[in-house]
Amino acid sequence: MKRTGSASSVPRFQRSMSYDQSNSPTAGAHAKANTASPAAEPAPSSKEKENWNRQEENDLEEDDRDDFGTAAISKVAGKPGETDDEANEKLRTKYLLESFDEEQMQRYEVFRRANLNKTNVKKLANQILNQSVTPNVAIVISGFSKVFVGEIVELARKIQDQWGDTGPLSPDHLREAYRLSRQNRRLYPQSRHVSHLFR
């Protein structure tokens, strides 16, 4: 028997031959030979393999995302899911930024771009804690420090307005802001080590 055509057409031809010979006395031998040979089952093409892999990945993702029906209940009940909360937060931020005037937008952009040097923060934390600090902890410390500096500067600007001063902030404004923040330090944890930020 000559094999002509592509590899995918060969198994079909062999199957049709086995069905045609089913009435002959040697049909059992041919059928056994066809089923035992590896050519009887067509090898899956690369596209079929990709489709199977995609289907398996989709099934696994569906299993991972299985919320036991709570997502459908929350949609029916009208409760927004986590993605809705994120979308609402982005929408609120967008509206807030649109309501800023030019000066507020400039200050916001400066605050977003301003960063504390993470290597210096890490060195300072290592020195104070007497142990090595991981990079993630240094990032957290620098983030909190940035917020603290922002609050001090904001309070110093209010003090500058109260005093009737103009121009850039002076060290006097920053000292007074730090003093007032220490008076209202109920939210900040107290430390045993007393250090003077402004001398």
From Swiss-Prot:
Residues 1-26 have a biased composition (Polar residues). GO terms for molecular function: protein heterodimerization activity; RNA polymerase II general transcription initiation factor activity. GO terms for biological process: RNA polymerase II preinitiation complex assembly; transcription initiation at RNA polymerase II promoter. Signal peptide: none annotated. It comes from the Eukaryota. It is found in: Cytoplasm; Nucleus. The keyword Transcription regulation applies. The keyword Metal-binding does not apply. Residues 1-88 are annotated as: Disordered. Residues 31-45 have a biased composition (Low complexity). InterPro entries: Histone-fold, TAF11-like, TAFII28_dom. GO terms for cellular component: chromatin; cytosol; nucleus; transcription factor TFIID complex. Keywords: Cytoplasm, Nucleus, Transcription, Transcription regulation. Residues 46-57 have a biased composition (Basic and acidic residues). It holds the Pfam family TAFII28. Belongs to the TAF11 family. Functions as a component of the DNA-binding general transcription factor complex TFIID. Binding of TFIID to a promoter (with or without TATA element) is the initial step in pre-initiation complex (PIC) formation. TFIID plays a key role in the regulation of gene expression by RNA polymerase II through different activities such as transcription activator interaction, core promoter recognition and selectivity, TFIIA and TFIIB interaction, chromatin modification (histone acetylation by TAF1), facilitation of DNA opening and initiation of transcription. PANTHER family: TRANSCRIPTION INITIATION FACTOR TFIID SUBUNIT 11 (PTHR13218:SF8), TRANSCRIPTION INITIATION FACTOR TFIID SUBUNIT 11-RELATED (PTHR13218). This is Transcription initiation factor TFIID subunit 11. It comes from Schizosaccharomyces pombe (strain 972 / ATCC 24843) (Fission yeast).
